[in-house]
């Protein structure tokens, strides 16, 4: 359980992806490619720009953010990746992001905002999503030991305690993972994790 980074090669260039594997709940995968944007798949469904997921998590955590505020959570290449993701995103608000994600996960165009919001809140609630204590510890130790983090807020998230609340995914976890993807993509000799040796 935790987050794992893997590399793929596209047209002779190496790109990294991340898998967030909980003990219980949906797998979240983030991938990057030549357009320097980050895309997300939840439970291997259709991908969408990571900016929609960032908006939804900010809203669920009762700290809604404008697109500019989302970009300011990042520095360097990670900020560029988020800006590029925003440019690819059809959704332009938290409500639209809930709807877009719901459509991709449920393969349905018949949805209202209340249903989409309820679905996402439930999907990542403690009752349906659990990183486990081990998963949270792995996530925290990875980002405590892998500089640089974008800002103090991301570093604070990486040192969260392993309470029941600490065993769910947070906006700052997503930010730390995006930062790591950008760092790996911009590090010449970076290599992915060997998942067989992480047990």
What are these regions (language model features)?
Residues 1-199:
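N-terminal non-catalytic structural scaffold regions of very large proteins
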């Amino acid at each position: 359980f935790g987050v794992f980074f893997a590399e793929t090669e596209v047209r002779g260039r190496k790109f990294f992806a991340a898998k967030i594997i909980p003990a219980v709940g949906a797998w979240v995968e983030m991938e990057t490619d030549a357009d320097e944007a980050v895309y997300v798949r939840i439970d291997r469904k259709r991908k969408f720009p990571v900016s929609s997921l960032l908006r939804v998590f900010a809203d669920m955590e009762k700290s809604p953010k404008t697109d500019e505020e989302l970009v300011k959570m990042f520095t360097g290449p990670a900020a560029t990746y988020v800006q590029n993701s925003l440019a690819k995103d059809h959704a332009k608000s938290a409500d639209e992001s809930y709807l877009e994600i719901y459509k991709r996960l449920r393969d349905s165009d018949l949805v209202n905002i209340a249903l989409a919001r309820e679905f996402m809140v439930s999907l990542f609630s403690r009752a349906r999503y659990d990183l486990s204590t081990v998963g949270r510890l792995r996530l925290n130790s990875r980002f405590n030991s892998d500089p640089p983090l974008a800002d103090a807020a991301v570093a604070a998230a990486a040192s969260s305690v392993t309470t029941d609340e600490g065993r769910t995914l947070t906006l700052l976890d997503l930010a730390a993972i995006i930062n790591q993807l950008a760092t790996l993509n911009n590090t010449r000799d970076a290599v992915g994790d060997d998942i067989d040796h992480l047990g």
